[in-house]
Amino acid sequence: MKVAIVAGTPGAGKTSVLIHTIRTLINEGYKPVVVKIDCLYTDDDVRYKKLGIPVLVGLSKDMCPDHFAIYNFEEMVDWAKDKGDILLIETAGLCHRCAPYTKNSLGICVIDATSGPNTPRKVGPFLTSADIVVITKGDIISQAEREVFRERVLEMNPNCRIYEVNGLTGQGCVEIAKEIIESKDIKDLENEELRHNAPLCICTLCVGETRVSKKYHRGILRRIDGFMEYEGE
């Protein structure tokens, strides 16, 4: 089965880009299915269901959505196998440190050109380890700003393929669909691995500690000066 994982910051247009891409995939005779990962709430599944495709929603709630998606990856693929031939996973995009792509999936980063020229330097592995970077909202900034933004993306990920896409009209989504169609299948799910390590977990805050004093905290901790240490038994 082909698996494409779509990551990006909130409001970048991930769902809109995927909807236009799915229409192209359907027109080409494919049977895409979608898993939508979010934190506390989503109604994006309603938009997907209007396309007449199977949709599964996963809410991570108190768990990091990146860890949640990774932990449930095998279950998502198993769910999709008898429903379609392409699995599209839309992640929550909660933090800039997300690293959701696996080695044999197609990693798609959706990033908003209006978020500022330094954003590509801030977002980490979901851009730097992506196969494809989709730049949205480029039509509402100047040509000079678009060129600077594009160069910053290439600075952080020189091997990626960049597409400028309009989430409203769908312009550019045919090319995204073609990339998905031409991507490789995941054949050995048991040995599939992440491209980049996930954000750090577990610390005392992760398991419910609310006191802020440093003396109450255990686990893998990073100090303000950048030093990382382990506190505990």
UniProtKB/Swiss-Prot annotation:
GO molecular function, one term: zinc ion binding
The name this protein goes by in its record: Uncharacterized protein MJ0120
GO BP: any one term: protein maturation
SUPFAM superfamilies associated with the record: P-loop containing nucleoside triphosphate hydrolases
A Pfam family recorded for this sequence: cobW
Taxonomic superkingdom: Archaea
Organism of derivation: Methanocaldococcus jannaschii (strain ATCC 43067 / DSM 2661 / JAL-1 / JCM 10045 / NBRC 100440)
Lineage of source species: Archaea, Methanobacteriati, Methanobacteriota, Methanomada group, Methanococci
